[in-house]
Amino acid sequence: MEKSMIKLKSTVIVVLFALLYLLPLNGRWLWSPDETRYAEISREMLQRGDWIVPHLLDIRYFEKPVAGYWLNNMSQWLLGHTNFSVRFASVFSTALSALLVFWLAMMLWKNQRTALLAATIYLTSLLVYGIGTYSVLDPMVTLWMTAALFSHAMILRAKLTRERLLAWGLMGLACGMGFMTKGFLALALPVISVLPVALAQKRIKELLLFGPLAIVVAVLLSAPWALAVHAREADYWHYFFWIEHIQRFAEDDAQHKAPFWYYLPFLIVGTFPWLALLPGALRSGWTERKVNPERFFLLCWMVMPLLFFSIAKGKLLTYILPCFAPLALLMAAWISGLAPVVRERLLRINSWLNIVFGGVLGLAVAALGLGIIVPHFYQPGEGLTIISGIVCFIGWIAFAAVSLRKQQTWGYLVAGCPLFLALLVGGSIPASVVDSKNPQTFIRSHQPLLEDSRYVLSDEVGLAAGLAWELKRSDITLFKARGELNYGLDYADAADRFVDEGAFPAWLADKRRSGNVALVLKTDRDSDDEYRNLPAPNQLRKSHRYVLLFYKQVVP
């Protein structure tokens, strides 16, 4: 009976994963700038056959190392030129992270129910789902940090020297791949997570003795590419270390500056539909650190990265994704160890929290649809879009309500709360957002004009990347704003890839002699102020914030 229940639960989790992570993947437009950027970088890598030096729009792009791009490359190579292939590497990495969570739970507690629950909590947590189906590098670096977490557990349980050597070698492998995916950050997180555990368990000597092995393995793994990119681009490491690491995280002009408490609300919302488990799980990691040292180990891997990112001046929501694997394990272990009566009470509280959460968000969508919160957020004729958005959260409430019926057996049905959101969110986004963040619709609507243009320009890098991806051409010229390609545009061979607004009339007069010109703009607001003073186009197409100015060739 027990085995059949475990098999049934495993099947349900696999089906839920397919419905959440795979089925909707191709049905949502790519978001700008992140998804269009990563889609185009890998498309160009495949087209150029250059897997060493990253380029975007055929311009040097040194913001990240290459391992994440390699995974995206393989996805596009295997699955073709689709939105599914753009996002698949993120989904694949998230699935592997969930498997590592399951295996680690089995290693720590040898209980399949707890292990399945940990994997389920991880996969259905709102933040993990949101980032895990979005084409960024964070799910990939999270995979390697989860592998480092797994390796650390092996280190703590190793008895023989050869077991320690293997575990520390695997730690080095995970750190090396993390470094190859997102840089020095992937080396810092394991160090700050391992250190307090070593201090608490008086294993500093072991850390000093075997830790260098992990460093050697990480260096050996990353050295071939690191040397190859240095040979090709001597300034790569200077830019990548000082600009991308020091300035981004530490200096006063760091990118994405935010206060210390920035991540707290995202942590709270990101743990839905399991929020009620959060306080007790974190508390148990500290109060039971002597009775259950594995919980303190997990707490360190969750809290130390969170503190690190909170102290850093530059902050982005996606940075805290690596915190959720140890958090899911802590939650599963804590609730599994509660007395049945206490567990049922906690699950009931959790269900009601989800009912309130779904109700508030459903009402928020309705209020947006009526123009109460933000006027004109939804446009006339978008009734079905509004209904779709409301149904997303009616589904959330429905799963939470059903889970109230029999808490002992049905309490974990809250795992299905995100299902309607996952399936319907693509059809719930208003046109005002689509026409400012999802350039594919606008590009496809005007594809004949764009394909008939010898020169295509854009005033935003994310939009330019979207044009390059859709048109399968990397020679998009930047207009007026250099954005994140500012560094690459300083190279002599990229001098003709940027046109200043003041020089545009003369540039246009010259280029129109040899072909049509298309200028695609993303305006700050729904007005003509930003293009009123430009040369008059032959055709002007506009949809909310996206504008296309088409200049027909002038035959000399």
Swiss-Prot record:
E.C. numbers: 2.4.2.43
Pfam families: PMT (PF02366)
Single biological process term from Gene Ontology: response to iron(III) ion
Cell membrane found in the keyword field: yes
Chief location of this protein within or outside the cell: membrane
Enzyme class at the top of the EC tree: transferase
Keyword Magnesium in annotation: no
GO cellular component, one term: plasma membrane
Bilayer-spanning residue ranges: 88-108, 116-136, 179-199, 207-227, 258-278, 296-316, 319-339, 355-375, 384-404, 410-430
Molecular function as annotated in GO: 4-amino-4-deoxy-L-arabinose transferase activity; mannosyltransferase activity
Localization (cell): Cell inner membrane
Pathway noted in the entry: Lipopolysaccharide metabolism; 4-amino-4-deoxy-beta-L-arabinose-lipid A biosynthesis
Protein family membership: Belongs to the glycosyltransferase 83 family.
Function in brief: Catalyzes the transfer of the L-Ara4N moiety of the glycolipid undecaprenyl phosphate-alpha-L-Ara4N to lipid A. The modified arabinose is attached to lipid A and is required for resistance to polymyxin and cationic antimicrobial peptides.
HAMAP family: ArnT_transfer
Name by which UniProt lists this protein: Undecaprenyl phosphate-alpha-4-amino-4-deoxy-L-arabinose arabinosyl transferase
The organism of origin for this protein: Pectobacterium atrosepticum (strain SCRI 1043 / ATCC BAA-672)
